[in-house]
Each structure stands twice: as structure tokens, then as C-alpha cells.
């Protein structure tokens, strides 16, 4: 079954229909020789094993084979999860530990995703864009090339409440720390959003906005460009 991940209602349908998962990992001491594992993955020998599987199946396995088990420790980090994390292995970007990136996210070459960043389903991150620590990009948020999304900033998602129009951050935009871009807002190319601002309406290209709600305070000038310089070395 196919889904259109640019449509919030299609994303919601996908989340509704997809099989939910509660994966667990078990460190186990015992003797599992000859034991039927079903779909549980098992690694190890010499009385020590690591098991991976769905919680219900693993729980049944542990109960039915308790006479063969000396001790075990079970770990899990989600419950009835609908969307897996993005596979990062083949992405040509710098992604630091602790970033949470869900599947169906697009990340451009030489992008930088810092610790604690959260990026939801359907988001698009352009080439050489930096998503700083603890920033949030909601469902279907679109960031262009060479954007800097400051620490703690939020680009609102458009999954709930659903909206056809995502947040769009055009190329070369700098968004300061803890700024909030509300649903459906477009930030024009080369503009600057001051730290702590709340942007409730579209921003044209080449301006600086600040405040709550954010207002245009000036055009981007050479002094502004010096203060908001993007460093290529951080993207290599």
C-alpha cells in the first residue's frame, strides 16, 4: 500500500494502518541449546545470549523456558511505535549522537544534525543546513540549503492539526535560538529570525524579523551578514 507523505491525512492513515512495534533486547544467561526461537533473533553461545524481538513473543519465550534460564535483563525504549527511526548509514551528513530522526525524512549532503535535535516524519533538510542542539522540526517541515536552525528553535509540524501547507524555510536563512516558526509560515531566502521570536506570518526575503509576534525591523545589511556568517568548515 502506498502513501503520499506530503499529505497530513495520508501520514495519519499510514500511522493508523502500520503494524505497531514494541521491540525489546534481552541479555540472558542460561542454556538455550535446541530451544525453538520463532522469530526472535539470538546471538551468543557458552551460556550467554543477546535476544532481539517483539515484547509479547519474548515474554512468552522467557516464561516457557524459565527452567533453562539462570538470569536475564530486558531493555526497551518504545511502546507500540508506529514509525521507526531513520537508517543513517548511507546519509552523507554529520549526525551527532542523541539526534532523534524518524523514518521518511530527507537529509541533504553535508547537513549537520546536532545532539538532541528532533526531526519528524516527512521533513526535508537541505544541503549544508545545520539543525542545532535541541531544535525541533515538525512533520513535513522543509528547510532549504545552508539554513541555520538555532538551538532550541522550533519549526512547527502540520500533522496535528492537519494542514496542506508546511513550514518552508528557504535557502540561507538563519533562525536564532529558541525562535518558533508557526504552522504554514514561509521564511524568504536570506532572512534572519532573531532569537526568541515567534513568527506567525510569512517573512519576505532579505529581512530581519524580531519579537513576539515577529515584525520586520530592518533589511539584511553587511553588518547583519557578518554576524550571521555560515561556516563551511562545520559542514565538512
From Swiss-Prot:
One GO BP annotation of this record: diaminopimelate biosynthetic process
Pfam name, any one: DapH_N
Molecular function GO terms recorded: tetrahydrodipicolinate N-acetyltransferase activity
Catalyses which reaction(s): (S)-2,3,4,5-tetrahydrodipicolinate + acetyl-CoA + H2O = L-2-acetamido-6-oxoheptanedioate + CoA
Record-listed E.C. numbers: 2.3.1.89
Swiss-Prot/TrEMBL keywords: Acyltransferase, Amino-acid biosynthesis, Diaminopimelate biosynthesis, Lysine biosynthesis, Repeat, Transferase
Pathway linked to the protein: Amino-acid biosynthesis; L-lysine biosynthesis via DAP pathway; LL-2,6-diaminopimelate from (S)-tetrahydrodipicolinate (acetylase route): step 1/3
Family (UniProt): Belongs to the transferase hexapeptide repeat family. DapH subfamily.
HAMAP family listed in its UniProt record: DapH (MF_01691)
PANTHER family in the cross-refs: 2,3,4,5-TETRAHYDROPYRIDINE-2,6-DICARBOXYLATE N-ACETYLTRANSFERASE (PTHR43300:SF10), ACETYLTRANSFERASE (PTHR43300)
Known role: Catalyzes the transfer of an acetyl group from acetyl-CoA to tetrahydrodipicolinate.
Protein name (Swiss-Prot/TrEMBL): 2,3,4,5-tetrahydropyridine-2,6-dicarboxylate N-acetyltransferase
Gene of this entry: dapH
